């Protein structure tokens, strides 16, 4: 009985934490973000200009920009559609209990895992759908006006807290508020795209069976000494994502791998080996690779000299975003305008959605409004992600990224480098992990180092 009472206290405590976080972050979500019409907006490799959209000097945050070889001028709706189409993964509550804990929410501690999920989700979007893909229903999401965000938050948590007191533990999925446009796909290609869209989101479901779900990521984190409720830094999450992809058994995921840079160095031969390790005479296709590079943009604070570097990274068509944030908060950085970064915030706590249900609601997996913050507020610890479809794509990307690093670096040495050869050629050999021990001894040492370096996340 005593243990049961303790569990109930813990559950009530998480309710209060969730309520506080939602009250706090709903104000941020409802606050309008403004974009200048005189500066380009860049979003994951595409560039949008709003200069010719209208005569107002400022545009509300529901518009944005993206980067590529071409510029999209004067079309706020195109940016908005592009931004909303990115997959948004946030705190959730009332999901199945995490093993070896009483936790049914990640509110207050899971934000870096969520931003890592968002980066991986963007890599999967590129892999299966391509950068040009946008969600047909993106512009039909209900407006997150100032009244609805706040009132819904209050109503939701009043009901949620009352339910916890009465012992009502029923799981509820949010009602669909999208216009009834689904199911009217014009062709087989659109049907296929929507199927992959749903499949990708389902891989991040909050249940033990989801290949990239929170429960699975926490299991991999245990191998590094982490547990549910602990804080995770960007570098640790990079290694957890790598293990999650390596261990994924879904047939659609066999053509993808993840490489994590060692000490800010990408060893080209190691990357190519990962891309070609399963190539046979009957199947000459290379694997696609997501390259994750943990870096530090300064000492205690971010060095503003690295601003051009961050801009350069987010301007590349290969970029899938940055796991970063500001002290005590993790964000998924996807673009910029002038000296401000554009991000998606995982701190808004939403209800559990059962993604195993056919036609589960998609609305809560897409953010209706981008947010901006000054580069100066960025915490120096972050992880940068790139996607390359094949070996040829990787070779081209490494050349382009190297040029960008040289141009943007004001220091004698760039933040990270691409080096020909294998890591073992430079005496950085890491012990191979056995099936029982998913992380090598060197990786365990890295986890301990990363844990002491990185900021605390709430």
Swiss-Prot record:
Active site: 111 (nucleophile), 345, 347
Underlying gene: Atg4c
Protein's UniProt keywords contain Transferase: no
UniProt protein name: Cysteine protease ATG4C
Modified residues (Phosphoserine): 451
Biological process (GO), any one: protein delipidation
Family recorded in the similarity comment: Belongs to the peptidase C54 family.
Activity regulation behaviour: Inhibited by N-ethylmaleimide.
Main location: cytoplasm
N-acetylmethionine, modified sites: 1
């Amino acid at each position: 009985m005593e243990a049961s009472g303790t569990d109930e206290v813990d559950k009530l405590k998480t309710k209060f934490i969730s309520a506080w976080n939602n009250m706090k972050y709903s104000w941020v979500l409802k606050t309008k973000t403004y974009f200048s019409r005189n500066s380009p907006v860049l979003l994951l490799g595409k560039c949008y200009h709003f200069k010719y959209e209208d005569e107002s000097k400022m545009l509300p945050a529901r518009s944005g920009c993206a980067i590529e070889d071409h510029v999209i001028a004067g079309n706020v709706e195109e940016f908005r559609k592009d931004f909303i189409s990115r997959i948004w993964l946030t705190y959730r509550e009332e999901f199945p209990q995490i093993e070896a804990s009483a936790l049914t929410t990640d509110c207050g501690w899971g934000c870096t895992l969520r931003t890592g999920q968002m980066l991986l989700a963007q890599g999967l979007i590129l892999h299966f759908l391509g950068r040009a893909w946008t969600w047909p229903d993106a512009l039909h999401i209900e407006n997150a006006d100032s009244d609805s965000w706040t009132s819904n938050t209050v109503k939701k948590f009043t009901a949620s807290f009352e339910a916890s007191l009465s012992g009502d533990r029923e799981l509820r999925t949010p009602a669909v508020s999208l216009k009834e446009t689904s199911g009217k796909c014009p062709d087989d290609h659109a049907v296929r795209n929507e199927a992959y869209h749903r499949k990708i989101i389902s891989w991040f479901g909050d249940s033990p069976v989801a290949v990239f779900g929170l429960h699975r990521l926490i299991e991999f984190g245990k191998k590094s000494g982490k547990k549910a409720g602990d804080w995770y830094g960007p570098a640790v999450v990079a290694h957890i994502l790598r293990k999650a992809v390596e261990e994924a058994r879904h047939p659609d995921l066999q053509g993808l791998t993840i490489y994590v840079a060692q000490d800010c160095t990408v060893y080209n031969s190691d990357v190519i080996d990962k891309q070609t390790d399963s190539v046979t005479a009957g199947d000459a296709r290379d694997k696609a690779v997501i390259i994750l590079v943990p870096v530090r943009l300064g000492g205690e604070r971010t060095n503003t000299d690295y601003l051009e570097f961050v801009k350069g990274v987010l301007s590349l068509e290969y970029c899938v975003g940055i796991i970063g944030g500001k002290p005590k908060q993790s964000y998924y950085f996807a673009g910029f305008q002038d000296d401000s970064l554009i991000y998606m915030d995982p701190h808004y706590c939403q209800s559990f959605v059962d993604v195993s249900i056919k036609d589960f609601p998609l609305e809560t997996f897409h953010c209706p409004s981008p947010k901006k913050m000054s580069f100066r507020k960025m915490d120096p610890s972050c992880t940068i992600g790139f996607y390359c479809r094949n070996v040829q794509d990787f070779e081209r990307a490494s050349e382009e990224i190297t040029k960008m690093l040289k141009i943007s670096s004001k220091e004698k040495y760039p933040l990270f480098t691409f080096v020909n050869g294998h890591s073992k050629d430079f005496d950085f050999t890491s012990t191979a992990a056995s099936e029982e021990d998913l992380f090598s001894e060197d990786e365990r040492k890295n986890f301990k180092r990363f844990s002491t370096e990185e900021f605390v996340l709430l």
